[in-house]
């Protein structure tokens, strides 16, 4: 297998893929769910997630589906091995609709099967169908065997189940990923390394050798404009390789803002343009080195940053057009403003002005030797213009530029770099410095908005650094820590300021640095003077949780800024519960005994700490996490004042936001008609909330009156001043309700049901928030009533509840009818709609059919007269008749058929007394349980044989009162008694003939006969209820003096008391 040949075990590759996938999805949820923003290809975490998903499909692929690279940029470097190109497009076509296949195969810039595979994955994420596609693939094991080896991730049942459950977290995200880019035509290094086809060492950013540098020039770092342009750079420094070729991709750093670099290089004619068509979506594919796989030390960072500025300054001088002095003075080289926001994520540049002129260094790298004319007035120089000085000229003709600084993050030390005696002072905060004394993380800083940052730097006068003898060509970004914490080269290429005084940089801090230090404000978190040993964890410890039956059980609890996790113990890292803080609705008070409650959407956690103080500390940390994970109100933030932009600025900042009306999508703002929110209709009698909302349907917004009750959400159309029922959604079909600002603003939200997603618009933000709050409360009330209907009846224990939640995700509302006879409410209560598909039934429509299991009405498609016994009618009425049920109920009964969900002793114990057959069955079940105790202690292996005969119903040996739907069906058919008798006969014969089991029998202490008797012999023996000793039934009836053993024990106790 290729992964083994490359030194990576297939199982280890799976863990690497899972770690990458989990980390990227959690980062996306943290960044986008609370703000309801759309995930695009500009997000580094989104590209990391795509790479991990691509690695899922590549892992374990058969060798015949992996071919060598047919072309690409790695072919330019003959000393490198070509990247393998795995192809699984025929497998994807088997589960994809023909229209989608046709669209992907007719994309203009996607012309390879590799490109179609990668485009298919991104399109599936955009459509929210990734989980659905994966389910379809896993249902076809024959195809998976054809394409994948036995050790592949997709052929591992447990790993595939984990992947399915984890992909459900993507439902809270909206994707708009680019899938039409020509970059997708070839595999990048990241998914191949994660899947094991390439060594993981190729992703290591610490290597600074030339070969490793060229390996970084993969498609991971190519954008729209920098895909194929090369810059011929010839340096005179003795440490420069003269045959070195600088490409735009090699000049890039790990950044999610690659389009800034490509646009700045392309628009200013710094690169040679390539002929031929360009992909319109290239700019949407960010550049990534995946540098989170390693961390560089400070020295490597210093060297790499120095090389970045030096090498790029050379590229500016040598690649400038040489058409004459007039062209040099009229054509600005760089006009994109400096973005401090991108710089502040990973590096901090400090430019310090000079009062003393010094001679500028000349560059020998110019190709034509033209001398540039100095500007007559430095004030007339356009903002952001890069200008090269003449050979031998002095820099006193240009004044020093204002200082632009960036604030230190946290309390990490500053490190200064310098270029000989001249050049900018580059300051880098070490990303892994252990000297920080604060618990405050990067997310606790409130950075200024981008437009303010641009205003603060609009007065910079930029000019390139001219050659220095210490330049080298190595170019890396080892100081970057992931795609989001990256340094934009679009800012670094303009960070070359002339007339800098190195001595002033060491003596006096710049005023801009002081100002930027004041601009950063800490909004929350504790400062304890010590470094946080558990980075990312806010609190951990042991708490007790109250179960369904009121029993407290201890768990090891971890609180992170995003979720609360419960483990079995601190050693056994088995997660039994994970609650997202995004769904936390209320935090209860701490009681004197340490009890406190956390209320989430659909469930409530009852927890208990060791003391009240400990409980209050838990609540404080939860509130702190909630404040951090949820967006705060605008009035709570500190207003940061910035100097106004100069009036003579040649251009306005490019990041000025358009008016709010321009941000509205076409379907929300292009109507041209103002919504009418007036409604004079009488509310429904059972309505909790009823108001006018606009529903998005058929590419337009239509007004409807929505009425919410404890049982359903009804939708009415107003015609002739009368309400006409248009649709009805049962509360049991509602999955979630979420804000959706992407539709046009905070007044928009969506309701996710089992049948459709309702996109709605309320009158204002408060009205939308009120609707979301009420729907969540109604849904929580319904789920609580369903749980009480079964749990309080004693039919479910905690283990069965977990199994049931997994098995009945879609039909969980039918659980309430398992032990309770349904009440028929009539067709009018359903609004004349089918309870399964919302099709209109009754009257002149389809004839309604009653489901005997749920008491609801269905159409002829959802109800096809399938017959089944009704468990609730057997339990309460001993009604063994088969009745017609809907297909939904039949599927539900099949899903839970083998689960022991009914405890007859708690639901209806009188059934044993009133029904003779149930009395005999209960007697046989007790015998079987006692025999199971004997076989469980025997070492002969008889228990395994008995388990085979049980047909996986091991609960028969655990409790005599637990029954499943399969047991009730066999009781109705009359075969259950024979099944139990066969089991009792087998087990009793073993006990009678086993030497070990017979030694655990009893001798009657009344007659002292040598015959061994057993407690499961109900016909001839009787057992003392107190000491559990077994006697002959005839001997006990004759003596009538009670249990001799109990009498002796009481006598001994009296003697001990007297003595």
Swiss-Prot record:
Residues 313-334, 392-401 have a biased composition (Polar residues). Residues 657-1059 are annotated as: Interaction with RAB7A. It is found in: Autolysosome membrane; Endosome membrane; Late endosome membrane; Lysosome membrane. Residues 40-182 form the RUN domain. Residues 218-244, 272-334, 354-411 are annotated as: Disordered. Residues 536-627, 686-780 form the PH domain. Keywords: Autophagy, Cytoplasmic vesicle, Endosome, Lysosome, Membrane, Metal-binding, Phosphoprotein, Protein transport, Repeat, Transport, Zinc, Zinc-finger. InterPro entries: DEF8, PE/DAG-bd, PH-like_dom_sf, PH_domain, PLEKHM1_PH, RH_dom, Run_dom, Run_dom_sf. A zinc finger (Phorbol-ester/DAG-type) spans 989-1043. GO terms for cellular component: autolysosome; autolysosome membrane; late endosome membrane; lysosome. Its main location: membrane. Pfam families: RH_dom, RUN. Expressed in testis, skeletal muscle, lung, liver, spleen, brain, heart, kidney and bone. Weakly expressed in monocytes (at protein level). SUPFAM superfamilies: PH domain-like, RUN domain-like. GO terms for biological process: autophagosome-lysosome fusion; late endosome to lysosome transport; lysosome localization; positive regulation of bone resorption; positive regulation of ruffle assembly; protein transport. A motif (LIR) lies at residues 634-640. Disulfide bonds: none annotated. Sialyl-lex is a carcinoma associated antigen. Acts as a multivalent adapter protein that regulates Rab7-dependent and HOPS complex-dependent fusion events in the endolysosomal system and couples autophagic and the endocytic trafficking pathways. Acts as a dual effector of RAB7A and ARL8B that simultaneously binds these GTPases, bringing about clustering and fusion of late endosomes and lysosomes. Required for late stages of endolysosomal maturation, facilitating both endocytosis-mediated degradation of growth factor receptors and autophagosome clearance. Interacts (via N- and C-terminus) with RAB7A (GTP-bound form). Simultaneously interacts with RAB7A and ARL8B; bringing about clustering and fusion of late endosomes and lysosomes. Interacts (via RUN domain) with ARL8B (GTP-bound form); the interaction is required for PLEKHM1 localization to lysosomes and for ARL8B function in delivery and degradation of endocytic and autophagic cargo in lysosomes. PLEKHM1 and PLEKHM2 compete for interaction with ARL8B. Interacts with ARL8A; the interaction is weaker than with ARL8B. This is Pleckstrin homology domain-containing family M member 1. It comes from Rattus norvegicus.
